[in-house]
């Protein structure tokens, strides 16, 4: 079994390119079906391919497992889905196979590959992705094992190291940037666009500064009302946002919209109504919620997820010792996963151990079924049960030892000597070692 991964993230691709490959959670299942169909139709070698997709603000990654790798076809499929050329995607992506896939997945789950080093949110996002793959019937034994081990390694990293200490979240970074623009955050009005997990985190951090007003704009009022009620805020429909945008000093947006929901014109009109008082805006969505041209307006201070990178990395130096500890834990996890793969892979030098065990069990079951059938026939004829049991046991013994006896007699002297050593080790151990 081969495992491969293809992805883009904040290290390799700019924000606008990442936005082309962002998949909302409810899009994952049909997307996985499309990928599996594509891999299966491209080659008969991939009828049972396993797939999973992780899509967040900072990364989109495809994980696959099949009898043979198909990285090139996976890249072509992803490029087509994002409407870019394979050459462009290749220049901004990374591809990994087997043990390197495990190392990468373990680092991602542990927060070592995040923009916010040590952040815990990615672990929940990975679990959501795995549940989506399971629900789509796209997850098999190999990828399930990979991700379950990823979660176990991440848990050990967080409990055994200080990787999450001193970290500054994206939400906290937004508050810090707002504090650089406004002297007193308790005197500002803040609008949050969306009602997902990231907006909830941002609302929590801003609420701690006791702003003058908190408002939630969301496509559905019910979800927005629940969040607003927690923080004593009010709520509006997303459609009403342009009419009220000028009322807010700070706007934090993170929705799953495929197109910008706050345009240049709306912000220009709002700034005029505000008589050019500054407006602080943070766009945490991928793809963008706020048109990038807004950044050119004199009184609009627009920040994206990539702009927050320098803020969230300020405490990174304090966590280098924890990173080294985490990498050691990950190394051990990778070795364990690779060993698990080798045991199950028929591509190893002497064949996979697990497939061989399965074949031995299958052969033994055939012999057992045959001898039991013979014994039942003899019992039905009225033969003595002691005689039947003796024949059954002798028949099983002969079948189990026939191949071994034949091998001991075959080949040259050197081959017979090697076979004799193996047979002695397997069959002539002491009773205590055999557990008898």
From Swiss-Prot:
CDD domains: NAD_bind_Glutamyl_tRNA_reduct. GO terms for biological process: protoporphyrinogen IX biosynthetic process from glutamate. It catalyses: (S)-4-amino-5-oxopentanoate + tRNA(Glu) + NADP(+) = L-glutamyl-tRNA(Glu) + NADPH + H(+). Pathway: Porphyrin-containing compound metabolism; protoporphyrin-IX biosynthesis; 5-aminolevulinate from L-glutamyl-tRNA(Glu): step 1/2. The active site is at residue 57. Keywords: NADP, Oxidoreductase, Porphyrin biosynthesis. It is an enzyme of class 1 (oxidoreductase). Pfam families: GlutR_dimer (PF00745), GlutR_N (PF05201), Shikimate_DH (PF01488). The record marks 104 as: Important for activity. One of its GO terms (molecular function) is glutamyl-tRNA reductase activity. NADP(+) binds at residues 194-199. Substrate binds at residues 56-59, 114, 119-121, 125. InterPro entries: 4pyrrol_synth_GluRdtase, 4pyrrol_synth_GluRdtase_dimer, 4pyrrol_synth_GluRdtase_N, GluRdtase_CS, GluRdtase_dimer_dom_sf, GluRdtase_N_sf, NAD(P)-bd_dom_sf, Shikm_DH/Glu-tRNA_Rdtase. The keyword DNA damage does not apply. Its EC number is 1.2.1.70. Catalyzes the NADPH-dependent reduction of glutamyl-tRNA(Glu) to glutamate 1-semialdehyde (GSA). Possesses an unusual extended V-shaped dimeric structure with each monomer consisting of three distinct domains arranged along a curved 'spinal' alpha-helix. The N-terminal catalytic domain specifically recognizes the glutamate moiety of the substrate. The second domain is the NADPH-binding domain, and the third C-terminal domain is responsible for dimerization. During catalysis, the active site Cys acts as a nucleophile attacking the alpha-carbonyl group of tRNA-bound glutamate with the formation of a thioester intermediate between enzyme and glutamate, and the concomitant release of tRNA(Glu). The thioester intermediate is finally reduced by direct hydride transfer from NADPH, to form the product GSA. Belongs to the glutamyl-tRNA reductase family. NCBIfam families: hemA. PANTHER family: GLUTAMYL-TRNA REDUCTASE. Homodimer. This is Glutamyl-tRNA reductase. It comes from Acidovorax sp. (strain JS42). The lineage of its organism: Bacteria, Pseudomonadati, Pseudomonadota, Betaproteobacteria, Burkholderiales.
